[in-house]
Amino acid sequence: DLPWKPHEYESYFCQLLGVPLPQLVPLAREGRVCACGRHVIDEFGDHIHSCKKHTGSTKAAHETLLDALEALCFQAGIKTERRNIPSVTKSNGKIGRGDLVLLNVNIGGHRHLIIDVALNHEFGGNHMADVTRNGAMRAADPARLLEATARTKIARYREGYANRNGVTYAFLPCVMSTSGRMHGEFLRLLFIIAHRRTVRWFKDVGDDHHSDDAFKFRRGQYFWHTRAAIGHGAAVAVAQRARVAGHTLRRPRVPPNARDALLFPATVPSGF
């Protein structure tokens, strides 16, 4: 199990309930400016989730989610590789690679499977053209955000990994939101893991003549467990993403009547 630190527990449940995060309230009251120079830190953490200046927190959260996935694969007897992941030329012409290789899973006509993880925030926090969208839902249907991210990852990686020279790979996007919603492809992977774990369990107990009902019951238990384990890992990751490092802050926000072409819409050129 992934350990909860007291401040992470507090941060996650404040975000779940939609109330200000205690560690961010003082920064918001002081008007502390993010290192991006475009926004002040809000007490709900929406900008921190959205701004690329907080990549340290984002990377820690990303690794936490991968840790949870690797633990589930281990329980199912699936070996994984997190280093030296093959790279491909993405659809946008840039070189990229997935996050984790699942070895010898034999899916979609390929021996190995590569997954790429993403954790979407459902609220705006980095809008400049219309700042009223910050703190509001990014889409009326949150599932659209998951679908858009998954489609982007599939377009970038699936064909490249399937048609590369040498060893080819299947590809699955593993996308979920900070509220805990999971994209269908992520659930598909968790079902595959639950199925493999069930097969392994009956093999370990030496039961080669189990009924279909017994198999489905055990698989249902493991599927529930995999979803709960990923939900727990995601909760810890969400709390980690809302953390503010000292180097990501600037000076307190200046009085509204002061002129600062970098920070305030009133002085930003119309084409910004």
Which residue ranges define each predicted feature?
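Non-catalytic C-terminal interaction segments of nucleic acid-processing enzymes
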Residues: 1-32, 37, 57, 71, ...
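Short Cys/His-based metal-binding microdomains
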Residues: 34-65
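Short, conserved catalytic/metal-binding micro-motifs enriched in Asp/Glu and His
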Residues: 45-51, 99, 115, 173
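Inter-domain linker/hinge segments that demarcate the starts of reverse transcriptase
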Residues: 63-77
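Short secondary-structure junctions
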Residues: 77-84
